[in-house]
From Swiss-Prot:
Keyword annotations: Cytoplasm, DNA replication, DNA-directed DNA polymerase, Exonuclease, Hydrolase, Nuclease, Nucleotidyltransferase, Transferase
NCBIfam families in the record: dnaq, polC_Gram_pos, PRK00448.1
Gene it is expressed from: polC
Name of the protein this chain belongs to: DNA polymerase III PolC-type
Family in the record: Belongs to the DNA polymerase type-C family. PolC subfamily.
Subcellular location: Cytoplasm
Record's catalysed reaction(s): DNA(n) + a 2'-deoxyribonucleoside 5'-triphosphate = DNA(n+1) + diphosphate
Function text: Required for replicative DNA synthesis. This DNA polymerase also exhibits 3' to 5' exonuclease activity.
Residue span of region Disordered: 196-218
InterPro entries: DNA_pol3_alpha_NTPase_dom, DNA_pol3_finger, DNA_PolC-like_N_II, DNA_PolC-type_N_I, DnaE2/DnaE/PolC, DNAPol_HHH, DnaQ, Exonuclease_RNaseT/DNA_pol3
Amino acid sequence: MTAKEEEKQERFQLLMTQIGLQDVTTYEEFTKDAKIEKLIADKKNKTWQFHLHVPQIFPAPLFHMMDVGMKRAFSQIAETEMQIVPENQTINETLIQEYWNLIVEPIGKQSPMIGKLLMEQKPTFKEPHFIEVAVHNDMEEATIQQRFQAKIIENYGKAGFPRLAMKMHMLDQSESDEYKAFAQAKQEEDQKKAAEAVQVMQKRQAEGQNGNSSAAPLSGPFQIGYKIKDDEEIKRLGDVYDEERRITVQGLIFATEIRELRSGRSLLQFKITDYTSSMIIKMFSRDNEDAAMFQNLKKGMWVKVRGSVQNDTFVRDLIMMAQDINEIAGVKRLDTAEEKRAELHLHSPMSQMDATSSVDSLFKQAADWGHKAIAITDHSVAQSFPEAYGAGQKYGLKVIFGIEANLIDDGVPIAYNDQHIGLQDATYCVFDVETTGLSAVYDTIIELAGVKMKNGEIIDKFEAFIDPGHPLSATTINLTGITDDMVKGSDPIDVVLKRFKEWSGDDILVAHNASFDMGFINTAYEKVGLEKADNAVVDTLELARFLYPHFKNHRLNTLTKKFNIILEQHHRAVFDAEATAYLAWKLIKDAKEMHDINFHDSLNDYMGEGDAYKRARPFHATIYAQTDVGLKNLFKLITMSNINYFYRVPRIPRSQLKKLREGLIVGTACSQGELFEAMMQKGMQAAEKVVEFYDFIEIQPKPVYAPLIERELVRDEKALEEILKNIVRVGEKAGKPVVATGNVHYKDPVDKIYRKILIHSQGGANPLNRAELPDVHFRSTDEMLKEFAFLGEEKAKEVVVTNSNLVVDWMEELKPIKDELYTPKIDGAEDEVRNMSYDMAHQLYGENLPEIVEARLEKELKSIIGHGFAVIYLISHKLVKKSLVDGYLVGSRGSVGSSFVATMTEITEVNPLPPHYLCPNCKDSEFFDDGSVGSGFDLPDKECPHCGTAYQKEGQDIPFETFLGFKGDKVPDIDLNFSGDYQPVAHAYTKEIFGEDYVFRAGTIGTVAEKTAFGYVRNYERDMNMTIRGAEIDRLVAGCTGVKRTTGQHPGGIIVIPDYMDVYDFTPVQFPADATDSEWKTTHFDFHSIHDNVLKLDILGHDDPTAIRMLQDLSGIDPKTIPTDDPDVMKLFGSTESLGVKPADIDSKTGTLGIPEFGTRFVRQMLEQTKPTTFSELVQISGLSHGTDVWLGNAEELIKNKTCELPDVIGCRDDIMVFLIYQGLESSLAFKIMESVRKGKGLTEEMEEAMMANKVPLWYIESCKKIKYMFPKAHAAAYVLMAVRIAYFKVHYPLYFYATYFTVRADDFDLTSMVNGKEAVKATMKEVNDKGMEASTKEKNLLTVLEIANEMLARGFHFQKVDLYKSSADEFIIDGDSLIPPFNAIPSLGTNVAKQIVAARENGEFLSKEDLQQRGKVSKTIIQYMDDQGCLEGLPDQNQLSLF
């Protein structure tokens, strides 16, 4: 070997030392002759590429260790990579697979779905150098080929492999199980390697301690592994930044998961937090005892864990592999006081985006502490009342129901000290003060300036600085521009005030926000021994709000800018006073012109009128329901605040609170309440006046007021204590109890972070972002007594304990929700439903009803009428009847089709009787009640043997019990699918039936979802310049979810209040999402809260009835006359024959593209596998496709294995009951089995025994056990009936079908492709498919539309261009063998503009593109698009002017 070669080997060994692998002996045979052939350093891009010559390709673990070691060792210098150059390039499948994870792992960062697909498999190797991977579909194949294939081959090449080729293998259905097993085995193999490493460490530890780690049964605290000593050093999770060999951490478990591996072992994975950070902990079971012990580790436990911290390639984060886990006593806050307090000011997650702890957790805490009562006081809402009531019952707490309201005075005065002075001739003294703060009591004036104005001219000026006697704060200097030098040595305040009082004389005093300036002046006058000013006063702020309510704000600088008034330096008294003077004169003139106001004592004549409530500044007050009357009054106030007085927030005028005061208790609330503000800003006298309105006074812990000190609104903690002591004195003097409340927004101090994230997400819109959030956790009695120790021990106990319980004792035990159902009453409803049912039955089945018909009717009517449900049927009948009269079919949803009375009253088209023939002429009938026929529609055509008339075919064989329960006492849930076009009409009709005051949209509450919370946390992490570990992000996300974000309305739910009650007996009322222009009001409570108390009608909007109506209009065919067993239509569900195209033409083996329920790729695959030929089999398909674990891994396997055929498998929930009864089981047991299976509860041993005793097949029993959710057969039958009708048009009237499909169901179009024909459409489809998983939602929706367009083109039809004079606004028009698209199919052209174009052309042809743009209100972009598409041929750009 040459010296140069030796040097290269030495360099390699030096490299191994630098990266910490000098002692790796396992791979010595691979490294001993290795050498660094060259190092390519790119200074510009800071990269180093090591070219290593080695005898043979490295084992994957060695390559990985070197790669990680180099990246870590040189991370501060350059990015590194290796190029292995082996002498021997022999490879095999084992080596290919060993490297696979390393090669594809980075792909997951770019495309998690493709990364997961590749990581969950191993490639196969085929000579000479081919690797093959499995994919599920074309999109996956295209994505891998285009984005990742070259990189995979390149990465193998860097590891020294010869040039590989790669191809994809499409999995068919039969291989899916094999693939899943393959992926599972692959994952377990990776975990096994990690487990082996853990076992080695555990073995060493056991040897060192001469003990064993066999786990004991859980008779005491949980423990796996060794006992961790009490004095062992605990590392904070927030201090773990890198891999560490052996450390101990502790924390609270907030998520657990146990995975059973095929090896028989278990993997325990849980997440813990110590509130400095969070971490994933993993542990593999060593034996069965460990595996059993894993089950005892629960969320909410505190544990101490010892193990090693390492980077986990699966989660791409630091995790701990645990060796020892010990349960420990958790960090628990106690309340040790003998006498307990009660919390009277507490927010739940229903305080919008402001409070985070659940009602249950807060109430549990109160109960654990031994408190006897707790109040709910969410911001303006009662939406947590139902949950709070339930939690109170659960934990034995008395619940006080209240709100923290936004109270307003009915009208804010414009003028004070009214005097009959002419406004046009008066002399005005316009002044402004600059102060050291907002409190007239604790702060002082540092500048006082004024100007005198008469007839719009300034005639005199006053200006003076005042020395405060102490340095100015930075805030004051920054806000006012006044410095210490400017005020130092100025006259003292008494001298300046005396001069100003003399100067202002008896003139009208004017200020912008006069209540503030006059408050300071009058308080200052009193301090220096002068009398308060009794001058007439005008407030320009309130006058501007009155005159210009539409302005966005009414700040001085905004108004002066609006009216071109010079304001040289805002927040300097002299400049503000002069600008205010000119503004005042402008306002005085406008007041005369707009409202004929001429005198000072007329300025308040309009106070409180119109939108005056919008101008009032809200302050907080707590309002509690003391009695049932008070609860109803509270509901009325909440309604009023949302319906009549909503402006940015719900507002309650003081006058309305006075009117509805009976049964209510009112408290002074927090720092935003008027009592605290009065004491802080105006002093004792003002506070004494304010407190007269309230029943009790609230004070809160000093930390709750911390933002006031931070913002310098309160000088310091000493000043805050003085304010609170004075409030206590005011209470004593007024004889009103002072209560210490917590203003609780979360349970524990550590929960503060969740609120911080939520408030941060709202940005500058939330004023709470102006300062650090206060500590507002739920405080124990001990903590509260400590907070108020500055009042003295006796007084602290009085406000914390005695008075809080005193207020609790004022309150009665209340129930905010009812126990019973209150349905509306319609006189004679019972007789009408009975008569309608029998009349229709006789009309169909003859005067002498068949026994099966009469028995079913009587059975149902007994339940319906006996339980008071007749009115529900009657209402539903009226709604459906009106829709039918107006020309729109109604589809039924859910299980209403299980009711024969619903069929007879025309609520549903589904007939639930056993399959039967029915003669429309002589009324003869023939029933098949032995289970031999699945649906009456499947019976062969037959003539009546009595009169020769063709039989009608009916009956879907559905038991009534699936609708109202076995006893017939379940509240009927009648869901009706109206046309989306007709839905608003149906909704409005309920107002006609019941009256507008008795029908409301069902309210919903939108809470922060996990995905949204994740965004909030990530934004917080970014804005705070933090790096948060994945497990900690999960914890923070969980803490932010479930908080109220908005309100809304159920898409079709209408709540009906009986006319013998009013809505306030059940719920307050509001507008959805605070949209005060909404046509409908909603229930304030989420409708689920009152679902069992009032009737809810589900009047839903659906495309199917809309499509049927359009098809009827186009064809003139009554959809009810369409046969349900048309042979060509049935062929559609198994082939493309009926369409006259080949499967390759439309890329589908069935013809169901665009058929509701049967057009998705998933259902089309089911059709291909099952090949249904009858209506009942289509119902089976519908049930199978909507259920959970009904098809996949269940019925699919049974059919594939030929265990049974499609008609025999369990498709819908009702099938179970019917089949079991036919098998001989007692009907009540059959019903119980059906209910248990459909709810995913499986079968009990007793159920299995009964089924086996009645010879139910074993496969049927096993199938029942797998099911998690099932679809009702009536729902499936109704859907299939609509689908078959629409399919009829597709087969026999294709252009009607396509025109309807594109009009009703499609939103996204590519008109360019569609107009240019089949090849253009296919090219666009390929473009979308080639994007694979990266295709957008809009592109995926377009793909569906293009599939239908392609099919239409394949059948010989075509699309025309949008036609300026033929196109409709929003419907596709048939023209010969083609369709003309509507205007709203043009990208970005909305329906309103489309209608405007149509309206404009009716008034005459367009003269030019310019004319189209002006009269049609069309944008230039749309004009350009239409021009490019050739829609505007012959139309000049501009109007032509002719002289002749």
